[in-house]
């Protein structure tokens, strides 16, 4: 039998809209046999997802989407099939959590100055884990500042906009080395979504390969 895979999905543990349990149920409805939960810089949703996956006969692979900086750009590296309790992985994700929280607070301050009241508190109320820009976007929609998430990024949260805050994420080699140390494989996430020219994408792929990366999403 041909298996159906989904190796990159998010839950409410980061910026997804479904809980880990509901996400696995949705995957089952869609006929997915092998699923990887790859929340941003966290693995807190995996245990919950695993319980439901076992009930429904879905193979759940440990996953995470690690935020990195490369040449001044934010690049996401997916880790798959790793030991989520490995000391290097837990240390890296703890560092990322601290960086993400610091950025979230700074974004909240900028939104306050831009006339958005209680921005951090509002976004946090919508989050099940770390506060992300997606939660701020949803809050902006909720209070009527914008009509949809996309408009929130275009007006406030996207790169170069008034409330954008650049995070000092780890570099790509650190992400790759950590994933490998934990027994997993490292993959460039959505390479065509970084608004880069073909020349820059090729540079990214070459660097990633030289640093020991294993593959990329297509």
Regions found by a protein language model. Give the residues of each.
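Generic hydrophobic/packing signal
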Residues: 64, 81-83, 115
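Active-site gating loops and adjacent loop-to-helix segments of metal-dependent hydrolytic enzymes
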Residues: 69-101, 119, 138-161
